[in-house]
Amino acid sequence: MELTKDLLKERFKEYNVAYFNNELKMCKFSLYHTTYELGQYTLGRIWIAKRPKNAGKQEWNEQEFKETFVHEMVHHYVCTVKGKKSFLFPHGWRFRRKSWEIKRKYGLNMLNIIYIKRYATLTRKQKLSIWNKLELLYLIPFNYLLTWIF
């Protein structure tokens, strides 16, 4: 499956009606080359990997693309509809609640794509990169907060 921005816009409209009751506003889309992320959401923009190289494949299959794209749309939903722009905990309770709702109603399981499915296929360098990012995002601010409180 070859990805284009037009295809992303078309799928956004389709999935918006199917999973979000047409609540989401159209956002911007970008395709990018990456080694370990399949998708990413930044304020008002959904980034999708051109090819899922980390999964050992060169092309997307339909189910994997749908799970990844709807996953990023849930981030867009939490940010725009719920008004919560959480960068520290992007997969917090609002994200998980909407994801479980979609899984319960439609059987679409997006929670298994949060670094779980692909982690085993990464190189040691990529795994260290992920852990370094986690340390910067979660552990350092948490330790700072604890030292500031106590």
Q: Which stretches of residues belong to each language-model region?
A:
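Metalloprotease/metallohydrolase-associated module, dominated by Zn2+-dependent proteases
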Residues: 1-63, 80-150
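Active-site recognition of the HExxH zinc-binding catalytic motif
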Residues: 67-80
